[in-house]
C-alpha cells in the first residue's frame, strides 16, 4: 500500500529504543550522487535548506568527481559545505564512510538522492542507535538495487504503483519540488539574458535548461534542433543552457543547423550557476522533470520532452497524463522532429503562449518547497517510529552486506571498479 503522511504517533516506537520525540528537531544527513550541477542535487539542496529553516540540523555529503560545472558554489550559496567522499568505493567502504559522517553529526536519518547509494546508506544506518536510511529515485524508471525494506521516494504515480507491486515495498510519492519564490518570472532578468545572446524582442526564444547528457537528454536535443531546421521560421531561436557528456556532439549538430539555415538559430551557452534568467528569457520552454516544473514556475509555456520522440505541450488537455507519468514520456513517434515542430507551431501564437503560461503557473503551486519539506518531516518521523529492534536491523544489514559482497565480487571479475550507474536528471 502507498504510504500516506501520518502523525508521528501512528506507529509505536519500541520501548527500549526511543525514537525522536514528536516535534523535536531532527538531524539529517543528505547524500548527493555526484558534483555535477543538475536538477536532482539542486532539489536536494533546496529541500535541505528548507528543512534547516524549519529548525532541523542538516549536513550534506557528495560523491567526488571531475565535472564541467560543479554544484559546490550552489551548495555554498545554500549554506552547505558538502563533505566529499571518494568516487570509487565498494559498498562496505562506502557504508563505513557514511556511518562516520552519521556518527559525527548524530544523524537520525541519512537520505540519499541516488538509488545506487541505497545499499551503503542502509548498512550505515544499522546499529544499536535507531537511525533510518531513505532513498530518493527521481529517475524515470524503477531500479532493482534499492533494498526492499528501505523507504523509497519516487517522483511519479506510475513508478510508485509499479514499485508497490514489488514485494510490498514501502514507497512514498514526492514530485521534485520548486522554489516558488526564487523561480518566479523576472522580466528584466530575461531581457538581460536575451541581450547577452543577441536575441531581439521580435524573435521567439525556445529555451532548454538542463544537463546535456547522453542519458535521456541528447535524443530530445537533437530532435529540437532538427525541428527548428524544418520549420525554418526566421524568428525562431533555440537556446540550450547546460553542460554534460554530450555537449560536443550537440554543439556539432547546432553548427550544422546554423550553416544550413544561414544564421545563428541554435546557441549552446554552457552551464550557468544561476539558470533562472534563461527561463525568464524564454518565449517557449522545452524540458523534463524538475526543469519542466521550474519553467512552469517562471510562467513559461512548456513542451515536455522524453524518449523515443515524445513531446507534448503542458495544458488542461495533458495535465492528467503528466500527473500520472511525471514530466516525461516515452511514447514512440515515427517522425520525432516533425512531431515536436507541430507543438512549436501551435505556440507561435502569442495569445496561446500567454494562456498556457498562466495555466502552468497556477498548477505548479502544488509543488512548492515548503510542502515538500513538511512531507519529508512526516516521512522521517514515521520511519523512525517504525524501525525494527536492534537485532532485526543488524540482521537486515548483515544479509544486505553479504549480497553486496557477492554481487561486487562477481562484477569485479568483469572489470567493475565501484563506479555509479547513470545519473539522475
Predicted regions and their residues:
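A short helix/loop element that forms part of the nucleotide-sugar donor recognition site in Leloir-type
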Residues: 11-16, 184-199
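N-terminal strand-loop element at the rim of the active site
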Residues: 25, 31-38, 44, 49-89, ...
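Conserved donor-binding/catalytic core segment of Leloir-type glycosyltransferases
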Residues: 28-29, 178, 200-218, 225-228, ...
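Nucleotide-activated donor-binding/catalytic signature segment of Leloir-type glycosyltransferases, i.e.
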Residues: 79-82, 250-272
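Short His-centered aromatic/hydrophobic patch
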Residues: 112-118, 137
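Donor nucleotide-sugar binding/catalytic pocket of nucleotide-sugar-dependent glycosyltransferases
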Residues: 149-189
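A short, well-ordered alpha-helix in the C-terminal region of glycosyltransferases
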Residues: 352-366
Amino acid at each position: 500500500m502507498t504510504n500516506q503522511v501520518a502523525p508521528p504517533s501512528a506507529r509505536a516506537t519500541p520501548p527500549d529504543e526511543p525514537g525522536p520525540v514528536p516535534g523535536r528537531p531532527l538531524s539529517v544527513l543528505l547524500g548527493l550522487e555526484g558534483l555535477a550541477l543538475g536538477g536532482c542535487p539542486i532539489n536536494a539542496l533546496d529541500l535541505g535548506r528548507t528543512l534547516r529553516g524549519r529548525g532541523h540540523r542538516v549536513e550534506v555529503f557528495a560523491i567526488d568527481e571531475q565535472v564541467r560545472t560543479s554544484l559546490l558554489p550552489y551548495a555554498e550559496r545554500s549554506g552547505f559545505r558538502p563533505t566529499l567522499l571518494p568516487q570509487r568505493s565498494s559498498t562496505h567502504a562506502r557504508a563505513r564512510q557514511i556511518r562516520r559522517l552519521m556518527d559525527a553529526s548524530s544523524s537520525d536519518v541519512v537520505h540519499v538522492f541516488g538509488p545506487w547509494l541505497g545499499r551503503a546508506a542502509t548498512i550505515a544506518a544499522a546499529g544499536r542507535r535507531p537511525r533510518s536510511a531513505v532513498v530518493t529515485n527521481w529517475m524515470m524508471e524503477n531500479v532493482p538495487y534499492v533494498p526492499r525494506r528501505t523507504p523509497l521516494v519516487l517522483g511519479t504515480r506510475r513508478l510508485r504503483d509499479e514499485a508497490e507491486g514489488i514485494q510490498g515495498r514501502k514507497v512514498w510519492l514526492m514530485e521534485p519540488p520548486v522554489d516558488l519564490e526564487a523561480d518566479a518570472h523576472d522580466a528584466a532578468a530575461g531581457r538581460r539574458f536575451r541581450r547577452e545572446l543577441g536575441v531581439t524582442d521580435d524573435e521567439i526564444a525556445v529555451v532548454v535548461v538542463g544537463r546535456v547528457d547522453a542519458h535521456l537528454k541528447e535524443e530530445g536535443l537533437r530532435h529540437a534542433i532538427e525541428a527548428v531546421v524544418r520549420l525554418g521560421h526566421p524568428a525562431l531561436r533555440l537556446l540550450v543552457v547546460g553542460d554534460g557528456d554530450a555537449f560536443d556532439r550537440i554543439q556539432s549538430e547546432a553548427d550544422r543547423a546554423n550553416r544550413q539555415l544561414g544564421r545563428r538559430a541554435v546557441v549552446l551557452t554552457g552551464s550557468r550557476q544561476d539558470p533562472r534568467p534563461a527561463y525568464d528569457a524564454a518565449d517557449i520552454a522545452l524540458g523534463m522533470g524538475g526543469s519542466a516544473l521550474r519553467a512552469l514556475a517562471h510562467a513559461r509555456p512548456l513542451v515536455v520532452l522524453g524518449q523515443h520522440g515524445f513531446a507534448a505541450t503542458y495544458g488542461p488537455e495533458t495535465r492528467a497524463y503528466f500527473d500520472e507519468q511525471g514530466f516525461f514520456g516515452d511514447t514512440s513517434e515515427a517522425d520525432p522532429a516533425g512531431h515536436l515542430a507541430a507543438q512549436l507551431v501551435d505556440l507561435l501564437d502569442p495569445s496561446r503562449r500567454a494562456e498556457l503560461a498562466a495555466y502552468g503557473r497556477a498548477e505548479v503551486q502544488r509543488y512548492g518547497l515548503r510542502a515538500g519539506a513538511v512531507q519529508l518531516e512526516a516521512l522521517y518521523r514515521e520511519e523512525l517510529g517504525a524501525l525494527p529492534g536492534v537485532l532485526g536491523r543488524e540482521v537486515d544489514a548483515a544479509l544486505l552486506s553479504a549480497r553486496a559482497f557477492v554481487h561486487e565480487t562477481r562484477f569485479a571479475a568483469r572489470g567493475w571498479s565501484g563506479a555509479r550507474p547513470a545519473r539522475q536528471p
